[in-house]
């Protein structure tokens, strides 16, 4: 399998996905796209947005997914059910091609035929114009950190609109590049790192090199980079959470490699596994076109992998620790 040249592709996509001088980001046009057919309600915000309904419950033995509802509920002082929906905007570029991604690949290629140039102020205006708008804005993708300016721009736009205290901002990060440090000013990094109404979820795209490379089409050695980048983000003081996907093409050594995965997480912070939510990959929507024999095997093997994760978690943490609300687990101590 030929690997994506991640760093080269990242540079090309960034050049086509952000205009720092005019503070514009290339945002996917969801209306009229293949993705629109998978939505439970029509796109909003002139076709550039969608409302995502987050699900807390998952089929056993998969752990419940409290993100981003529980952090949002804590900040906003609202019941979790009031923040289970989010206003999603997707930047139109991603440097990896995860086969299970729910976004059509033509919305990840920084193609202006399927996207539009918008400022954070324009996105916030579109959001505020929605009559029944969610209390959470999810800056998704794509890979938002190909355009890291987007997050501080959104924070500033919400503040200027007088909405900063009533909206919880959330973003995804696939832990693939150092653009947060390369392209943001000290002031912007400080803003993002200390912003009270912001949370970031970082996705580990596997539990070993083989699963990572299979899932992303990136070089296997970039799996180690994910841990290095998370360590740097942790130093910012940002409110961080994690996802992990356990789809893997090979069943041999799952228990051993899962133990090593937790070792590496705990080397970053002893409580980090308690802030990580494993995601069960499902075969639906645009994903169905990408599923062949290998992917079917991976979908089955993730069920073995989650048992290994649960066993390791039970061996390393008490029942009381595992039942703590995710927001009660500090990574700053």
Feature map (PLM): residue ranges:
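Short strand->helix junction
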Residues: 108, 144-145
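Glycine-rich beta-strand-to-loop/alpha-helix junction loops that act as flexible
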Residues: 139-143
